[in-house]
Amino acid sequence: MIIKRTYLLAAAMAIMVAISCKKEVSTPDPVQTNTVDTPEVVKDTLPKLPKPIKVYSNDTVSVKAYDYAGLEYFLKQKNDTTYVVNFWATWCVPCVAELPNFEKINANYKKNKIKVILVSLDMAKMIDTKLLPFIKEKQLKSEVLLLRDPDADSWIPKVDSTWSGAIPATVIYNAEMRKFYEKSFTYDELEKEISNFK
Amino acid sequence: MKKIQFLALFLVMGALAAFTNPLAGGYKVGDTATDFSLKNVDGKMVSLKDIKNAKGYIVVFTCNHCPYAQAYEDRIVALNNKYKALGYPVVAINPNNPEKEKADSFANMQQRAKDKKFSFPYLLDDGQKIFPQYGATKTPHVYVLQKTTKGNVVKYIGAIDDNYEDAKAVKQKYVENAVDALLNNKDVTVKETKAIGCSIKA
């Protein structure tokens, strides 16, 4: 069931309209008020979920692949959830090492509206042989997306102007805040960073 | 008293700058790059100044284990084959600490150089002292240097080209374009690019 809710959030200095489009029913936000005066605007500005350029599947696992234009949606969602977007690959040793910390955050903070998205940068030839078996073997519960856009110079600066291109790299954002990290995370470090996003 | 307050303020600001900008030590285009003396896979020490007939250098931080570096190995060999004779030889440096990444040990470097028929020096950044001066953060990471009277000037930093996956689908050969421009006494148009790579294991 898809429930669309429009929240009007009034801040001391500015009024901000945030749109939430969720697949799950969530507990109502105490500060929300239903807006009746701006539905047309909302409809026009609500970004649509992009179509993947390809879906890679085996018997048990399926991963949606996007080019950067598609992936951008997942880096700019404005709702009441805080997103932890981790750029990784199965061949990246420090990425694989920190992955359980992101999985644990995703599991432990689900009720707190924190969602982990794992953006794989595995190469084409590795998707069937490495990525899909890895997701199955590790039983990854966080959402895994695949970024298939080899012209990296065109999109790395759009993710963050300070990103050199080394992975692991992580973006944490919500409707109000955004931070970029070109580093590995322990669970405690990740938890501490997320606690700043309220 | 005021002086002390000012001093304290400066110290705090200095400390903040040092902590908030850890990558500031790297070279920017236009900077003069340091020379080095690093051990090649043939056991001999190599410095840029020892390379004869060089007009400049294509310094590539690369390694054995990284799939992105592997994807570019043949293209790095091709760069050297094309540009060494023109005065821009490739000098490859493995910046990784072999204790952190066993695949990048000196013995494995020797094997890799042999297997892939590297026609250029493949040096170990022993002690991981050179890559931080250049500001390399990942493999592969290229610095095109031009030899001038005031030293080796950084003319290009970044990726080899715009498609790591498929050499045939490349549209922009960044390094070739930069070296071609230098050989023709022209300005390098694309001076800096970003690419995905494996973080350096220091």
Region roles according to the model:
Chain A
Residues L132-I167, A175:
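Short, internal strand/loop/helix patches
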Residues A166-K198:
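Thiol-/selenol-based redox modules, centered on thioredoxin-like
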Residues D59-T82, N108:
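A short beta-strand-turn-helix
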Residues M1-A65:
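N-terminal targeting signals for export/organelle localization
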Residues F87-K104:
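Conserved redox-active cysteine motifs that mediate thiol-disulfide chemistry
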Residues L99-K138, D151-P157:
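Structural microenvironment flanking redox-active thiols in thiol-disulfide oxidoreductases
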Residues K78-Y83, N112-K115, L140-E143, A175:
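Loop/turn elements at helix/coil->beta-strand transitions in domains of secreted/extracellular proteins
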Residues T81-Y83, W88-W91, M123:
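Short pre-active-site segment immediately N-terminal to redox-active cysteine/selenocysteine motifs
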